[in-house]
Every structure is written in C-alpha cells, then in structure tokens.
Amino acid sequence: IDNDILKSMRRKVDENGTRNLLENLKNNYPSLALRSTFIVGYPGETRAKFKKLIEFIKDTKFDYAGFFPYSKEPNTASFYMKKHLSNWTKKHRWNKIKKVQNQIALEKAKEMMGQEIEVLVDYFDENTGEYVGHSQKLSPLVDFGVRFVDNGNINCAQIIKVKIYDFDGSDFKGEVL
C-alpha cells in the first residue's frame, strides 16, 4: 500500500485512492465481500513499509486475502531493482501477514454464526455424507465451504437456505431451513 512500492510496481493507484475506493465500496455495498492479493518482500520493502501493509490489512479487514512472497522474474522492472530482500525475510513476512489475515478470517467466521444465508449446492461429499456449497461471498475451491446434511431431496446447482451454526477452521456447518 506504500506509494513508493506501488509506483515501482507501475501501479496506477496510490494509497489514498485505494483507501477511498475501499471505503466507498464498504459504505455503498455493506454485504460486499472484499478480496485481494498482496506481494510481500518486494524490493525496497522496509520494515516500516511492511508494518504499514499489516496495519492496512488490519484496518481494511478483507474477507479474503492471499499473500505471495516476491519472486524475481526475468524481464520485469523489479528484476533489475536493487534492495532485494533475503528469502528468509520474505518467508518470515509472508508467515506474519498470513497470521494477521487468518485472525481476521476467524473473526469474520464468528460473525456468521446464526446467520441465514443462501447456498449454491456444489456437490455431495460421499466421505462425510454432507452436501457442500458456497454463498455469494464464498468462491468455490478457494474459500471456506458450507457443509450441511439433508434428507436427500437436494440437487447440485440448487440454491437453498442454510442457517450457519459452526465453523471448524476450514468450513462452515449449517442446517437446512
């Protein structure tokens, strides 16, 4: 989110523009799920700039965020930059920022308890005897799923109403309404 880093990445946005856009989206679309990806350990990323990124993640509270350690790719502007960080530093920062986002994800999962949501049924898991689906906010195969049991009258690609009652760290558990 640091302006110097964004400029060196040749991004056409800056910190203020990004923050204003996100605030506008949150205010105008309160049920919107915010998702993004971030590179950590980019050349020139100081401790202070990394700390600023962590604070941005904490302030924004993305519903879902992915993080990738910077990798030096030939024929890119960053390939020729100075101040490349060590692999240890990149991995350490990657682990640290993932922990921050994981805590945010757990807080958001707790907020889901008791909510009634519409779920698109993706498949029946024969190993567990549960149906698995996702809501509008959940991306299949990437995010948490919603698991539930039914009497067998449900079909894949059907949209059903489910009340969330648990989160096991990888999926929500729900009751068909």
What do these predicted ranges mean?
Residues 1-64, 72-89:
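Conserved non-cysteine loop/helix-boundary elements of the Radical SAM core domain that shape
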Residues 80-177:
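Terminal RNA-binding accessory module
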